[in-house]
Structures are given as structure tokens and as C-alpha cells.
Amino acid sequence: MITLIGTSLAKKGLVFIFYGGSSKCESCRFNRTCLNLEKGRKYIITNVKKVTHKCPLHKNGRVQTVEVEPATIRTAVETKKAYKGSTIIFRNPTCVCECENHDICYPEGLYNDDKCQIEEIGPELVCKNGRNLTEVILSH
């Protein structure tokens, strides 16, 4: 996918979450290119083009053309479902307490019912709710 990002952020490998645009973007002729990503999703820049455009909202007053793709996301799944290469439907756990795994169990960029593939298997996690969880890297 092609999009535009502030020139100071336009670096291959940069991972970011797209939160949407400003109301000032509505009248811009580049808004379809800038705002063509899905809100709340995590992306990684895979290529940086030389083309830049003026933009009063960004730090250096310019945006740069970049290629992006959905980024992989670290999360936790039930250990019995943690098989590299398998496809799962992501669901946030229903926890009764907040713990050190909260950011892993509730990652930004994934929504309930997202169809994902397990790319990597990490360590088993200690869950205060007694669930058997394993850290994984998902693509969607």
C-alpha cells in the first residue's frame, strides 16, 4: 500500500499505528493517499520513495511517499492453540485483573475476530487468572 507520512518519520522499518487524520486533512488533495489506511491498525514501512509534498500538519512541513504493509503483532494465545503457521481468530481474554501481561494480551492493532496467522512462538506466560498462555507473533 502507498501512503504519505511526515518526512521525519519516513524510515524503512518504522512501525506505527494509524489513528486517522485531522479535520484539516479533509480539504487536502492528498487526503485519499494519506488516509487510506485502516484506523487502529499497526503498519511497517517497507520502502521510502523520494517524492515529497507540502503538509502544514507535519513537523518539517512535508510528507513523504512510503510503501507500508500490516505489521506483525506480539500477543498471547491459549497454549493449546499456539502452533507456528496455524490460523486463528483473535480474541482478547476476559481478565478480572490487570497484570504484567496486559499489554501483550490486549495489543494495539488487533481487534476481536481478526483472522490471523501465527508467525512465531515465544515463551509461555504466567497468567494471574490461571490460564495457559503462550506469547506469539501474529500477522493478519
Curated annotation (Swiss-Prot):
SS bond partners: none
Similarity field: Belongs to the UPF0179 family.
Protein name per UniProt: UPF0179 protein Msp_0996
A Pfam entry, by short name: UPF0179
PANTHER family for the chain: UPF0179 PROTEIN MJ1627
Superkingdom in the source lineage: Archaea
Organism placement in taxonomy: Archaea, Methanobacteriati, Methanobacteriota, Methanomada group, Methanobacteria
Organism of this sequence: Methanosphaera stadtmanae (strain ATCC 43021 / DSM 3091 / JCM 11832 / MCB-3)
Coiled coil: none
Annotated signal peptide: none
